[in-house]
Amino acid sequence: KKMSKSKGNVVVPNEPIEKFGADAVRYWAAAARLGLDATYDIGQMKIGRRLAIKLLNATKFALAIGREDENHHVGAAAEAAWNPADVTEPLDRAAMAKLALVVRQATEALESYEHSKALEVIESYFWQFCDDYIELVKNRAYGTPDEHGNVPSEKAVKSARTALGLGLDAFARLLAPYLPYATEEVWSWMHAGSGSVHRAAWPVVDPYVEAATGASPELLTWAGKAVEQLRKIKSEAKVSMKTPILSVALSAASEGVEAIHAALGDIAQAGRVVGKFDLVAKHAEESAAEGTPETEVAVEASELGEPPAKKPKH
């Protein structure tokens, strides 16, 4: 029903702001399309609160990489400056290619006064960036050796850290109109002493296009689907996600196989694949015969190792 003072069904903002935070209430309001009535929706506010918390946590995590001492204390942040030329790995370049696309689409939407459409575009990629990209590159960003003891090169480590920095810096700017308080907080972490995010320039595509150097954003999509299948193997077996995979074969369309192969090291480490990792290209006819969409990744065969021993409770 439409809010009416005479009907006594007016909701004042004090209560939801105190319960969910001002950013969450602003998110709900911003999600409404221009010219249409907005339904009072607590569910939307909860989503906004979750988005703000995720931005805080993701930024805190990324900024801590490389700054922890042996006691896991995080040192003071150096001045945040990320050079797009340092993004050299295929997966990192794909993430930057998608970011360039998102910046362009969000900018065009806002210039057309479609603020809810801009939010939708930004938010969709933000979750992909956190759930897929960060999970895929965090081991490399930390410089963690793989299951065979191979340590990533300094160049590969720097590539991941630079892409993380460029990405989260962009998201702080992109989400500032929607989550003013959370973005101001993360901006102060990344750019201490440089003023407010609300005085910072809106992102432009140039640095992300430079970092992408012609990469396709689809590489990140395929890599995310591959690691999702590796997790599915473990969830269906009801074992810990830390359980090693001794061998696995994944199938996908030929372009998917090519993309997955380009990010195979990151995918294997994220999924804890310690042995043979085969990729099988499927033709459109095969996918159609099996009723599998051409855009999907499937598990053809897998073998799990022993789950890690549980730590005793003290």
Specify the residue positions occupied by each region the protein language model found.
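Feature 926 captures the class I aminoacyl-tRNA synthetase adenylation module centered on the KMSKS loop
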Residues: 1-12, 17-18, 41-314
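Non-catalytic, structured segments within soluble enzyme domains
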Residues: 27-28
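Short helix- or helix-capping micro-motifs
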Residues: 21
